[in-house]
Amino acid sequence: MHIAVVGLSHRTAPVEIRERLSIPEQTMETSLQSLRGHEQVLEASILSTCNRLEIYTLVRHPDLGVSAVSEFLSGHSGLATGELTPHLFNYHHEDAVDHLMRVAAGLDSLVLGEGQILSQVKKMMRLGQEHKSLGPILNRLLTQAVSTGKRVRSETNLGTGAVSISSAAVELAQLKLGQSRGLDQLVTLESEQIAVVGAGRMSRLLLQHLQAKGASGVVLLNRTVQRAELLAADFPDLPVQCRPLTDLDQCLSTCSLVFTSTAADDPIIDAARLEPLNRRSKLRLIDIGVPRNIAADAAAVDGVESHDVDDLQEVVARNQEARQAMAREAEQLLQQEAQQFLEWWDSLEAVPTINRLRSSMETIRVEELQKALSRMGPDFSARERKVVEALSKGIINKILHTPVTSLRAPQGRQERQQALRTVERLFSLGDD
């Protein structure tokens, strides 16, 4: 058995490719079932975010398993394998474990050290458990990854400061506004008329950062106004006007800055929608949805400046050096967590031998116990029989404790295999 991950991210694929591979939660069960239906895939889990799509698997054969996942991604996206492959990465075993630890810690994120990715890894594990696509190996790996992410944020400086895709989007708006005034710096958003489209987790983070950066008010649009109102209620100090999505055209006519973050499968803003507005002032659109909420042709409309998640690199580069120094603090911790999982994985090699050893000892125990009890005669009470049986079990457990602990202990693969062969020879443990 082998652990493998196949995926793509902001590092390997542009947003127009990533959006075609995005797997929303409502189709996650079907996708996991499809993967598990392949004879090569024993366990599977999917991480799908705006910046990455990664599929973690336990497979029978690494190359055949990776091919199975690649074929699934090709079918899901509608992209030919030859078109998709240049954007994919794959890692096996130790490299796959190391990669997941880095992802959970935020070290592989566009915004280095971002906190939201840990919640997304937790969600990946929860969905895998709910849809029964996880087994003991990936369940243990994901549990270790979540532990790693928590430790990095609590034990290193990388956990300081709120960083996320949403915070970078707000900073991008500040930067572009400053540049329009001839300034290479972030400026306040106090005078901007701002709209946020969508009322999910990303929109919540947008409202938090807009409030922190001086926004004087926000129009919050959503298909369901009630959901927008529930979100707005959590921001009593920020004037939020909740409106239905049918008011989007009006907001595009009056607002100067619009953020989009919806789960729509297709763009909700495009050139055809913007051109009739005949705006006289600049409209800045910032889209952090994947799939994209704003069509690529929107940027061609006069007076419109459109950005997507790939444009956040400009903001990220401004403070990346400082966060890189913080990230180095986390490297040793990541190595410890990865090694802990790999030692557990290696110890599984001893399980069949340990089980055969226990079975052999249990057979001997039962046979000898029956001989002893038959000699005791009918006067031997049921209580006394239980005491003797407990005694026999205790003796066996004491005898087995040291060899079993030794077989499970961290050690090199060659040393473990030699120890297994020694135990099997000494106790005559055959595969039968």
From Swiss-Prot:
Enzyme Commission number(s) from the entry: 1.2.1.70
Binding positions (substrate): T49, C50, N51, R52, S109, E114, G115, Q116, Q120
Record's protein name: Glutamyl-tRNA reductase
Xref: HAMAP family: Glu_tRNA_reductase
Species the sequence originates in: Parasynechococcus marenigrum (strain WH8102)
Domain of life: Bacteria
Residues of the site described as Important for activity: H99
Other information: During catalysis, the active site Cys acts as a nucleophile attacking the alpha-carbonyl group of tRNA-bound glutamate with the formation of a thioester intermediate between enzyme and glutamate, and the concomitant release of tRNA(Glu). The thioester intermediate is finally reduced by direct hydride transfer from NADPH, to form the product GSA.
Gene: hemA
